[in-house]
């Protein structure tokens, strides 16, 4: 038996195979935009690349968390601007109700609007952002980076009945009413305190936004 061997043809075929593999790899690199297509391209480089890719994904998620937290805080402040306007009008009504030339009927008319504004503020206190309460006694915790470090936002509790911190005494009809000059005077005191408390809360929200944007 005679076995014919064409070395030139075999060498050419081998070279063609190498060229085809290199072309396939080059096309894969072009299509993926990655220098490392297979582990054998650069085993150590692949390990480093995988770590970076995972960290980038976590960073992206953390940035998304921060953006949502800022939107949450801005929504809080938007509602609190409306509360500020309502409290200003309530304060005006309490002063009008203390006018000695006003009759009980006049005060009753003022009370209708006053009560509506109380209900308006009370309703705002129940608002939520994607089902997360906007106003509560506990600050929300936000993951702010890829290493899972967190930042606890300042709590904003408008429903607190504590006179020095909340607004409830201003929008609760049992503690603030303007049917008489005496009750109107007491209501005005509650509203003045609530206006200051609201300003403090908005300052806390501003601090939250500032920290989240750092």
Regions found by a protein language model. Give the residues of each.
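Alpha-helical transmembrane segments of multi-pass integral membrane proteins
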Residues: 14, 213-214
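Donor-binding/catalytic cores of nucleotide-activated saccharide
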Residues: 4-24, 28
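Amphipathic helical oligomerization segments
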Residues: 28-29, 35
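Parallel, heptad-repeat alpha-helical coiled-coil signal-transduction segments
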Residues: 15-24, 50-64
């Amino acid at each position: 038996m005679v076995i014919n061997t064409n070395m030139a043809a075999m060498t050419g075929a081998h070279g063609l195979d190498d060229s085809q593999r290199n072309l396939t790899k080059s096309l894969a690199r072009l299509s993926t935009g990655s220098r490392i297509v297979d582990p054998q391209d650069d085993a150590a480089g692949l390990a480093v690349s995988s770590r970076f890719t995972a960290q980038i994904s976590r960073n992206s998620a953390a940035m998304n968390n921060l953006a949502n937290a800022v939107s949450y805080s801005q929504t809080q402040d938007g509602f609190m601007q409306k509360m500020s306007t309502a409290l200003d009008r309530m304060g005006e009504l309490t002063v009008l109700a203390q006018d000695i030339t006003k009759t009980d009927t006049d005060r009753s008319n003022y009370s209708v609007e006053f009560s509506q504004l109380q209900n308006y503020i009370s309703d705002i206190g129940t608002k939520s952002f994607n089902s997360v309460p906007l106003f509560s006694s506990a600050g929300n915790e936000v993951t702010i980076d890829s290493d899972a470090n967190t930042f606890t936002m300042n709590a904003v509790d408008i429903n607190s009945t504590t006179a020095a911190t909340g607004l409830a005494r201003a929008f609760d009809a049992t503690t603030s009413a303007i049917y008489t000059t005496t009750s109107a005077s007491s209501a005005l005191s509650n509203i003045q305190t609530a206006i200051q408390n609201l300003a403090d809360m908005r300052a806390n929200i501003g601090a939250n936004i500032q920290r989240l944007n750092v």
